[in-house]
Amino acid sequence: MREKIILVCSECLSRNFTTTKNKQTSKERLEMNKFCPRCNKHTLHKESK
């Protein structure tokens, strides 16, 4: 079953994006490079708790 997760900017710590993830197939935390509107640049976004 897919669960909703929140992606947090690693620089300004704003919660910008939500996405889904299959926890059975991917156990590790998700990390993506996405655009942060608050920083106004592409930054690393990590899955929050």
From Swiss-Prot:
PANTHER family: 50S RIBOSOMAL PROTEIN L33, CHLOROPLASTIC, LARGE RIBOSOMAL SUBUNIT PROTEIN BL33C. Keywords: Ribonucleoprotein, Ribosomal protein. NCBIfam families: PRK00504.1 (NF001764), PRK00595.1 (NF001860), rpmG_bact (TIGR01023). This is Large ribosomal subunit protein bL33A. It comes from the Bacteria. Belongs to the bacterial ribosomal protein bL33 family. InterPro entries: Ribosomal_bL33, Ribosomal_bL33_sf, Ribosomal_zn-bd. One of its GO terms (biological process) is translation. One of its GO terms (cellular component) is cytoplasm. GO terms for molecular function: structural constituent of ribosome.
